[in-house]
Amino acid sequence: MIPVTEFRQFSEQQPAFRVLKPWWDVFTDYLSVAMLMIGVFGCTLQVMQDKIICLPKRVQPAQNHSSLSNVSQTVINTTPLPPPKPSPTNPATVEMKGLKTDLDLQQYSFINQMCYERALHWYAKYFPYLVLIHTLVFMLCSNFWFKFPGSSSKIEHFISILGKCFDSPWTTRALSEVSGEDSEEKDNRKNNMNRSNTIQSGPEGSLVKSQSLKSIPEKFVVDKSTAGALDKKEGEQAKALFEKVKKFRLHVEEGDILYAMYVRQTVLKVIKFLIIIAYNSALVSKVQFTVDCNVDIQDMTGYKNFSCNHTMAHLFSKLSFCYLCFVSIYGLTCLYTLYWLFYRSLREYSFEYVRQETGIDDIPDVKNDFAFMLHMIDQYDPLYSKRFAVFLSEVSENKLKQLNLNNEWTPDKLRQKLQTNAHNRLELPLIMLSGLPDTVFEITELQSLKLEIIKNVMIPATIAQLDNLQELSLHQCSVKIHSAALSFLKENLKVLSVKFDDMRELPPWMYGLRNLEELYLVGSLSHDISKNVTLESLRDLKSLKILSIKSNVSKIPQAVVDVSSHLQKMCIHNDGTKLVMLNNLKKMTNLTELELVHCDLERIPHAVFSLLSLQELDLKENNLKSIEEIVSFQHLRKLTVLKLWYNSIAYIPEHIKKLTSLERLFFSHNKVEVLPSHLFLCNKIRYLDLSYNDIRFIPPEIGVLQSLQYFSITCNKVESLPDELYFCKKLKTLKIGKNSLSVLSPKIGNLLFLSYLDIKGNHFEVLPPELGDCRALKRAGLVVEDALFETLPSDVREQMKAD
């Protein structure tokens, strides 16, 4: 016989595919095996046994009905006539007599073959082969989607990920956290779920899509001691699983090839079932035990009419009825499958019950082939979907990232990154991490925390452990904060720096930091809430003293006006956007420092002259060409620092002499050609920067500046320095590089406090040895060509090189 196992290749699939075989597919597989056995058994009998046995019919005209009946019975049954009674004279001898046909074995074989081909109905001949073929087609249809490249690749990928998610220690840990919930909460959740199920009746809603999930037990009995332990390797594996699930979901949700293929193969099986039932029911009666055969072979055998016996007719008849029963059950199962496919919304899958039972509220619903495979999984075991859902949750992913972060960033490793920032605070910078490690809050000596390009940061209540924390920097970070952490920051935070690209990166909780003293904002702001980020009122920042905004505003935001009464320093860096409305400046009566940088200003704003408390004004990188309004600065008695650098100012008006309180003046990177002697009537100037202009002459009145400590005319066109410059005995820094100087006066030795001298880029041929009298000047503070330095006496050179 042919073993059934030879046909397993038609239905063979990977053992892991069983999770995508619902009960009806398993049931039809068993039915297919039964039908396959019928076909194989019938084919084996057909091959190994005689198909038909025929005897010739002899027509005798003069016989009564009795004798004809005897002859017919003899021919049909191929049994000899009863022997004649033995002669009494010879009782020991018995002679067997019957109807002689005068046919040999070859002729009988020929007759059997001819009658099998001509007289026997085709259904009786090919019944076992038809059963075998139909069954193999059923098997191919049932398993085609497991073999087709376009679908099998998705299925294999899905099952691979599913198995890893099911066995992942992170899944056990995530679900074990749910099992520890308060029993009252779980009872309330269950009651709410039952009520929602009662209300939702009639057509299936979104919850009914995953109705099989209701059979999942609400609690998992997990040993928390084992569930809580997750080493670094397991954490990395779980992290990789999250990425795989994300990519797989994006790939599979794009199409519905799996659903379409499963529907088509089911429809094909139903059509085939109807065809089989139709023609088998009509032809099963053609399987007869006795067959009359009329073939024209009289010239070869001497007979034309034959009576044949289909030896397997009785068995085939029973097998055909049995086969029809199996096919009927198979077909009804396929009809139920079609009902399930079209009645249920299988292109959408809701995790509503999983969200309710696990408390993980952000598990998304899925669609298309992803949803269909999950529906199929639920028919196998709903627990697979529940454990798989853990890897669809961003909350779960964030918890895992947090755990991995804590394992990677230990307190000792974080302490190695500590540094002192510009505010002389001990700062910890963290850049481009997946989150904020909990171990940060174990570094109690931390004074400043700087976070850059970190998404979904959650500041926990444990930040209260950082007793010394005063400064927080958030650069392109979306931050959420625990209520207890917010209370801590309200009391302790002094400095907040925020760099943002969109509204999500501008923390809404910053408006309530009542003890905040310094606020630095960098990002695009707009007065139109529909276009960009808007700044809300800062009125609750009662302690705010310094406000810096680097943005593109066209006027001073109203939020700034809300803190004008106590604001002491305001900086606006406008990135070239023209600042046109400055009337709100008049309300900032306590302002001591004002920076309007890169605001495309063409004139000094008149509102500035109302700031009687102003001490420092910076108008860097504007479009100032004339500063005639500088005369109004005489009313600003406290103004000590004026920065007009990086503009297009061509001359300095004589009115500058009225700024008698001026101590620091920045005029670099302009187009000044002539220095007015009246400038040096501001005799309190300690810092004077005139570098990068077109100045050719330094007035001798510079000697009046007896408080001058810093003087720079780098990159001008000065050809000589007045001797009066060396009367400025307090001068510490002198920058005269990149000019047209040819001689350095020996009087430079009068500058006893000189510690920095830049003379590089001139036409000097020799340096005066009097430089040795500048005891504070060392080689590191002398910027000069090496060849020119060698012109100094050796003792002077050694003196400068000495520490």
UniProtKB/Swiss-Prot annotation:
Stretches of the chain found on the membrane's Extracellular side: 44-125, 288-320
Molecular-function annotations in GO: volume-sensitive anion channel activity
Recorded GO CC terms: cytoplasm; endoplasmic reticulum; endoplasmic reticulum membrane; monoatomic ion channel complex; plasma membrane
Domain of life: Eukaryota
Reaction catalyzed: chloride(in) = chloride(out); iodide(out) = iodide(in); taurine(out) = taurine(in); 2',3'-cGAMP(out) = 2',3'-cGAMP(in)
Region Disordered, annotated ranges: 177-211
Domain remarks: The volume-regulated anion channel (VRAC) channel forms a trimer of dimers, with symmetry mismatch between the pore-forming domain and the cytosolic LRR repeats, a topology similar to gap junction proteins. The cytoplasmic N-terminus preceding the first transmembrane (residues 1-22) regulates volume-regulated anion channel (VRAC) conductance, ion permeability and inactivation gating.
Name of the featured protein: Volume-regulated anion channel subunit LRRC8C
Species of the source: Rattus norvegicus (Rat)
Lineage summary: Eukaryota, Metazoa, Chordata, Craniata, Vertebrata
Gene transcribed to yield this protein: Lrrc8c
